[in-house]
């Protein structure tokens, strides 16, 4: 049996990097969505290794890459290089390094899946296994919540937050797995006994996506669905699979949405999760049976090409009718569209949850801090450096200085704002160029590929990208590698020139022998630099996390790890910030002051290091220097109430203590998100 499996892999060698990559994607998805450097950096090293192996194995194919696909790789590489260049002028260089490295990981993913020569069947296997793997991860997440003695730890303000820790990212993660599953469930090329499993997985994933009650996903997914129906082959089959998956979800939705109601009303969350799980199980069982029966029937039903073309036209017509009907119903529900849009705009500009949500978050107003995030990101940060930007992912510094809310986002909750504010017009143009070139490459596959299964893979890639780009326009999904990497990968598969029974001949880009040798040498050098760039911050972050969690048992060992972490990543102030915090809790003000001083030297705009230094100086009798540090902190973060309190109390005989500062910051986190899997300390 093992020999047979190895022989099967030898016949489809592209499955080897594909299976390793999707295993990485699923692991990232289950590891808080892969938004921290300790998660995405090792994934990037895996991708780098896969790219090196793929480039060697498919070296003859490198000269035959489709021109649009090659342009996409070059433009994305240029965007990554620009992001690294932005470190030079970024105020927080460690954050800019992380932002550039994250973009590097996405480049590696796109390159891996572009270089490999995919056959439609192999591509379908990879996409299908990803969806099934994600559904299996979802089963564990749901079972953990339903069986937990404290199920509320899986929620943030009544919304499902696992496995990413952020509700909106949970919705985007599972919807990302929905597209391949629902499409493959409609394909005749897929064995009939697997189509039911895929349809059940599709239904389960979209049901999981309801638990976070993400308003952005509810707004965006209709556009992605319409786009999917426009670009997918065999629209009748696709429409049937969609109708079944979404219909079963609609039947289970009231029980699923009740989790939020019970949680916000203070009810038994565990029972609510159990009821939701039962409803989802019944719905998915129905989908399993229906999908299997349809697959069996479809495998024995032969339709002429003219009938399929007619059915496709009917599918387009029905989609158009559904869109028009939806618009009519929507207009009837909202009344005057101008007044409705104005009301929603005023909601959006207002405070978060100013009017409450009632029994469902979908029915509440649109208030949030995003209007202020985007306003500062564009009118202050982008306007101050429109060409080059403030530096990759350097949004937080400028926002704290100019904000009108009490929120402290690290990212602007918008991919366009992130690009403009962080990388300026240059970086934004490079990234948009990549998207256009990648889309052209995928559309070529969609239009020219001889096999409907391959054209369907292109449709899945396009639909997933449309959903991701629309949703990430209003959220920080780019930061979650477990969400972004699959989207990039599917674009690479579909745009890289898949092979069929009659392979599409790509437009070659001839390269003379000296150029090839030079490119190989340059690629080897770049690979070494990339490995170092990813490995050192990753090891530094792991050592820092280890010190932060293990210092009560051995403080000296923790300090030693932090010293090493500081040396490995000379751009990051985090090791010193953690060292200072540990020293405060160990009642070692001298060590704390030294650590926070080093942190302030690495990040002069770090207000937390400044307030801690000011407080330590006041406690040590150095009033003049302490007050100066507090005023510098206020310049960096004028709206921070802790700084105002520290300055006011510095005038008397009872200055604010470092312990009080840390306690207040922890209380603030607990008041905003409550006790979750990541903030269990909030229960105490």
Model regions and ranges:
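Hydrophobic transmembrane alpha-helices and their immediate junctions
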Residues: 425-459
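Transmembrane signal-anchor hairpin modules in multi-pass inner-membrane enzymes, especially those
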Residues: 1-85, 91-98, 102, 108-133, ...
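TM-adjacent membrane-interface loops and short helices in multi-pass inner/ER membrane proteins
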Residues: 166, 354-410, 416, 423-430
């Amino acid at each position: 049996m093992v020999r047979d499996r190895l022989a099967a892999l030898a016949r489809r060698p592209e499955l080897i990097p594909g299976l390793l990559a999707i295993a990485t994607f699923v692991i990232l998805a289950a590891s808080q969505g892969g938004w921290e450097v300790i998660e995405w950096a090792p994934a990037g090293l895996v991708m780098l290794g896969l790219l090196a192996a793929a480039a060697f194995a498919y070296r003859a194919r490198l000269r035959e890459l489709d021109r649009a696909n090659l342009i996409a790789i070059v433009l994305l590489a240029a965007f990554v290089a620009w992001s690294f260049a932005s470190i030079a002028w970024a105020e927080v260089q460690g954050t800019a390094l992380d932002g550039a490295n994250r973009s590097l990981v996405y480049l590696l993913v796109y390159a891996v899946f572009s270089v490999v020569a995919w056959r439609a069947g192999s591509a379908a296997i990879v996409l299908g296994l990803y969806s099934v793997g994600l559904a299996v991860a979802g089963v564990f997440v749901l079972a953990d919540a339903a069986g937990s003695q404290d199920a509320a730890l899986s929620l943030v303000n009544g919304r499902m937050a696992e496995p990413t820790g952020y509700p909106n990212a949970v919705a985007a993660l599972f919807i990302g797995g929905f597209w391949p599953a629902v499409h493959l469930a409609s394909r005749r090329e897929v064995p009939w006994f697997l189509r039911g499993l895929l349809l059940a997985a599709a239904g389960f994933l979209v049901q999981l996506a309801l638990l976070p009650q993400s308003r952005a996903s509810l707004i965006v997914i209709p556009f992605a669905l319409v786009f999917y129906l426009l670009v997918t082959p065999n629209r009748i089959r696709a429409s049937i699979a969609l109708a079944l998956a979404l219909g079963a979800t609609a039947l289970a939705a009231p029980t699923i949405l009740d989790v939020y109601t019970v949680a916000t009303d203070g009810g038994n969350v565990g029972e609510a999760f159990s009821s939701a799980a039962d409803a989802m199980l019944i719905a998915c069982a129905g989908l399993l049976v229906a999908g299997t029966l349809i697959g069996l029937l479809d495998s024995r039903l032969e339709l002429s090409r003219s009938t399929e073309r007619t059915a496709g036209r009917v599918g387009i017509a029905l989609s158009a009718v559904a869109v028009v009907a939806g618009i009519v119903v929507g207009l009837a529900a909202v009344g005057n569209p101008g007044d409705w849009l104005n009301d929603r705009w005023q909601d959006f500009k207002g405070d978060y949850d100013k009017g409450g949500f009632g029994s469902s978050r979908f029915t509440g107003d649109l208030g949030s801090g995003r209007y202020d995030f985007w306003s500062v990101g564009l009118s202050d940060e982008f306007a101050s450096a429109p060409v080059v930007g403030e530096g990759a992912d350097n949004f937080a510094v400028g926002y704290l200085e100019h904000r009108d809310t009490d929120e402290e986002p690290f990212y602007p909750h918008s991919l366009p704002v992130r690009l403009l504010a962080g990388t300026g017009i240059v970086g934004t143009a490079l990234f948009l160029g990549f998207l256009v070139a990648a889309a052209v490459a995928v559309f070529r596959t969609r239009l020219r590929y001889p096999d409907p299964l391959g054209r369907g893979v292109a449709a899945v890639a396009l639909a997933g990208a449309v959903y991701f780009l629309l949703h990430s326009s209003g959220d920080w999904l780019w930061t979650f590698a477990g969400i972004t990497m699959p989207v990039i990968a599917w674009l690479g598969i579909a745009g890289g020139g898949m092979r069929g029974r009659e392979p599409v001949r790509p437009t070659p880009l001839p390269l003379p022998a000296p150029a090839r040798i030079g490119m190989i040498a340059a690629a080897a050098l770049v690979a070494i630099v990339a490995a170092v760039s990813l490995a050192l911050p990753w090891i530094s972050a792991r050592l820092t996390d280890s010190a932060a969690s293990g210092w009560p048992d051995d403080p000296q060992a923790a300090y030693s790890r932090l010293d090493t972490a500081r040396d490995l990543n000379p751009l990051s102030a985090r090791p010193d910030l953690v060292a200072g915090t540990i020293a405060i809790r160990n009642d070692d003000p001298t060590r704390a002051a030294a650590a926070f001083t080093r942190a302030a030297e690495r990040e002069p705009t770090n207000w937390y290091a400044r307030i801690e230094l000011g407080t330590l100086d006041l406690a040590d009798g150095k009033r003049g220097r302490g007050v100066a540090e507090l005023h510098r902190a206020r310049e960096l973060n004028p709206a921070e109430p802790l700084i105002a309190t520290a300055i006011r109390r510095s005038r008397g005989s009872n200055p604010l203590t470092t312990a009080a500062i840390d306690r207040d910051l922890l209380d603030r986190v607990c008041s905003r998100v409550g006790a979750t899997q990541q903030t269990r300390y909030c229960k105490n």
